[in-house]
Regions:
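Feature responds to low-complexity, polar/acidic, surface-exposed segments characteristic
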Residues: 2-92, 99-165, 179-251, 255-262, ...
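Short, flexible, surface-exposed loop segments at domain boundaries
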Residues: 169, 173, 180-392, 396-556
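Acidic (E/D-rich), amphipathic helical modules within compact regulatory domains
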Residues: 46-51, 55, 66, 72-108, ...
Length: 556
């Protein structure tokens, strides 16, 4: 049955459901996000410290050692700072930071409880990314280090005063820039020269923590049925084909987002550690013939208010059923069943990513466990589906990111069948069903008892075949849409509160208190019969309404 939508095309601006900041570019982070970032990556511990609080030199040494992934606990504390005793709780970190060359060893005292100044913080950052020799060559402390920090692009928004104490919030902001900066190495040197080199992408994160990052679009997660490859449970798929295990329950609603994903290999799997999601402009177009058209790199949405053009970027990324695709024609850009999601990643009013999801619904009649052949219920719209469901070496069957077990393929289960441009096929299977009386129908779907369900565009039945007041078992696909309805006889028991008899030719309706305690209004078929209070006479709905308009009766 094809669903008739009276509201034209549905344009849905998807709300951001993830709980992290909106900026996804670069390494600059506000203090609150930087704290979450370092804690998620297990680099710095989560601390309840006010952003305005000052940072001591001992605190800075602890942070430096953790960021440079040095094992401070095993380092020898040789005691050359007179004010840092070997039994001091910060001694290991202080002497390790000095050994790494981030703090100098020239002074007899370290002053662990003194506030770290802004200029000192900049010097520490410069030393951590390998710019110390270059900074000394450019004038030394503080001017040479300030120049080096500016060259490394970590100074924006950071004060450089030699007397002012750096706040905890500014310190975290500086550290977030530092761990994202490319490291500087000495390529060659002689008595009168030093040559430096930068390897793009080689940072503190990659070098010391083996943490990688990728900026791109999340095109799938494990809740989706059809992807470009089989997903493991609790995983996300990026548009570069990278699959990341997602063990954080807070990272939901990522599909369609342009994100920076930080991940690390653990036990042979890339595990998602942290996500920064950008607040993209996202519009979803639901398939309905005549609602919108596509031509000349733009979608044209037609409604009662006229025509609206949604322009695509000339080099927009197009993914059809989870697979990157080139040379797509207009027929694919306008799926008969499914939806098109448009994503404007940089808010320039042109959509950079197009996610096309197209599927067909099928209902299993039987499944042969030995041959692997799936026999479908007959439907005029399923002939092509039957053809490409014939088992072959290119067919992959998945369910919510996992391979389907043969026990999942049973009669009356619903398949959502997806096909990619390369010819591969993916299926999701749904064994969901709901039973109840059809209490009403409208443009959006059917009301079953107290709940409403949309009807799939290529369902097996039409609305004209359904009768209000009848009891059905409805087969649902993975999107909770009705695909088929099977009539069943069912005895309902309840307490009639009132009848209503509309004028004209409308159906008599009964307000019934059900056994669950809810009140449901049921339309009554003209053929229905009800017993009177003595259980003797059988009356039609119209006769009963006239006779018992304000009475209450127990009926079954």
């Amino acid at each position: 049955m094809r669903r008739t939508l009276c509201f034209g095309i549905a344009l849905m601006l998807m709300l951001m459901t993830v709980c992290y900041p909106v900026s996804a570019k670069g390494g600059s982070m506000a203090a609150a996000e930087a704290a979450r970032f370092f804690a998620a990556l297990d680099i710095l511990p989560a601390e309840d410290t006010a952003e305005t609080e000052t940072v001591t030199r001992a605190d800075a040494a602890e942070a430096v050692v953790r960021i440079m992934h040095a094992d401070a606990a095993t380092q020898e504390t040789d005691g050359y700072f007179r004010d840092v005793l070997t039994d001091d709780p910060h001694a290991a970190a202080i002497y390790t930071a000095a050994r790494l060359g981030v703090f100098g060893k020239g002074a007899e005292t370290f002053e662990p409880d003194a506030a770290l100044t802004c200029a000192q913080a900049v010097k520490l950052a410069v030393c951590m990314i390998g710019y110390q020799k270059k900074a000394e060559a450019m004038g030394g402390y503080p001017s040479g280090y300030i120049k080096a920090a500016r060259e490394a692009d970590i100074l924006d928004g950071i004060p450089t005063d030699t007397e002012t104490a750096i706040s905890y919030g500014t310190w975290l902001h500086l550290l977030s820039k530092t761990v994202h900066a490319d490291l500087l190495d000495v390529a060659a040197f002689g008595s009168d020269y030093v040559h430096f080199k930068i390897t793009p992408g080689r940072t503190i994160l990659t070098e010391y923590h083996h943490i990688n990052s990728y900026e791109g679009v999340v095109i799938a997660d494990s809740t989706m049925a059809a992807e470009g490859d089989v997903l493991k449970e609790d995983a996300v798929l990026l548009d570069n084909g990278e699959k990341l295990v997602n063990e954080n329950p807070d990272y939901v609603g990522l599909v369609g987002r342009y994100v920076t994903a930080y991940y690390k290999e653990v036990g042979g799997k890339n595990v998602l550690l942290y996500v920064r999601g950008e607040n993209n402009n996202i519009i979803t177009l639901h398939a309905e013939n005549g609602s919108y058209s596509y031509e000349q790199n733009a979608y044209y949405v037609h409604s009662g208010r006229g025509e609206t053009a949604l322009k695509l970027d000339l080099y927009a990324d197009i993914l059809y059923n989870g697979e990157a695709t080139d040379g797509i024609d207009a027929s694919v850009m306008l799926p008969k069943n499914g939806k098109v999601t448009l994503i404007d990643r940089n808010e320039d009013q042109r959509f950079d990513t197009v996610l096309i999801e197209e599927y067909q619904n099928a209902v299993i009649d039987s499944f042969d466990r030995f041959s692997g052949r799936i026999v479908l219920k007959k439907s005029p719209s399923m002939t092509e589906t039957e053809r490409f469901l014939t088992p072959d070496t290119d067919t992959v069957i998945i369910k919510n990111g996992r391979r389907i077990a043969k026990d999942d393929l049973k009669a009356d289960n619903v398949l959502m069948v997806y096909r990619t441009k390369s010819g591969r096929i993916w299926l999701s299977v749904s064994s969901k069903s709901v039973s109840g009386i059809l209490s009403g129908m409208d443009e959006d779907g059917c009301r079953i008892d107290e709940s409403s369900f949309a009807v799939a565009q290529n369902a097996y039945v039409t609305k004209e075949e359904l009768r209000i007041g009848e009891y059905y078992r409805y087969l649902l696909n993975a999107e909770n849409e009705i695909v088929d309805a099977v009539a069943e006889s069912q005895q309902k028991t309840g307490y009639i509160l009132a009848f209503s008899k509309p004028s004209g030719f409308g159906k008599v309706r009964a307000r019934v208190l059900t056994g669950s305690g809810s009140i449901v209004e049921y339309p009554l078929s003209d053929k229905v019969t009800l017993q009177d209070k003595d259980g003797k006479s059988r009356l039609s709905a119209s006769e009963m309404a006239s006779r018992m308009e304000n009475e209450k009766r127990l009926v079954s």
